[in-house]
């Protein structure tokens, strides 16, 4: 019995890189003739950092910085060996973190 489902989780700080990577993965899966569901957007995580502007005085003067982590999931049902090989050959952007699980 082979793999029934692949879950591909993508994370990135920039939405444009994430969307481009999603389209590349979906195109690679669809060329193999396999059904893919997604990309399913997940909630965006926000990390906010508060930094003092001055090193010594003026505690009231502060700056806020935020990092947003965008996530998406793609489910691939009954992947074949050709699809797995297509996914391995993909060259995705450096700012995108890809995690693949077999379910």
Swiss-Prot record:
Function: Involved in the binding of tRNA to the ribosomes.
Subunit structure: Part of the 30S ribosomal subunit.
Source superkingdom: Eukaryota
Gene: rps10
The entry's keywords: Chloroplast, Plastid, Ribonucleoprotein, Ribosomal protein
GO biological process: translation
GO CC term (a single one): chloroplast
GO molecular function: structural constituent of ribosome; tRNA binding
Location of the protein in the cell: Plastid, Chloroplast
PROSITE patterns associated with the record: RIBOSOMAL_S10
Keyword Plastid included in the entry's annotation: yes
One Pfam family it belongs to: Ribosomal_S10
Protein name as catalogued: Small ribosomal subunit protein uS10c
Family under the similarity heading: Belongs to the universal ribosomal protein uS10 family.
